[in-house]
Amino acid sequence: MKLWLLRHGEAQPYQQHDAERQLTDRGRQQVRDTAEHMRGIAFDRVLCSPYIRARQTAELVCATLELANTIEIVPWLTPEDDVRAVTRKLDGYSVETLLIVGHQPLLGALAGWLTDADRLHSVPMDTASVACLE
């Protein structure tokens, strides 16, 4: 499986409810720019965090790339979710190309865990950055 990890674009400063933060104008442009680099990739599934900024990111990517994929919102892709629990959930997806839209520190921890680069440290991922793992 090719696993694509995409961190959401730049979001509004921290608010009372982290899950409700939205993308800034700059964040939206970051996402569109990143999506252009992914043009031509046929994603079998798109999984996304329930947080607003991640959902906005997934929607922008699908719109920019003119993907017909339905975005599947899953509750286990929040910033503090356990990487081992996430990998167990991912084992249930038998697809060739999967896009996950989420957050740090989860995505960086997932990249480190799956590559065995360093299971104790997170891989840095800036806003709207993407990593592809095979």
Stretches found by the model and what they are:
Residues 2-84, 107-108, 121, 125-128:
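Active-site-proximal alpha-helix that buttresses catalytic centers in soluble enzyme cores
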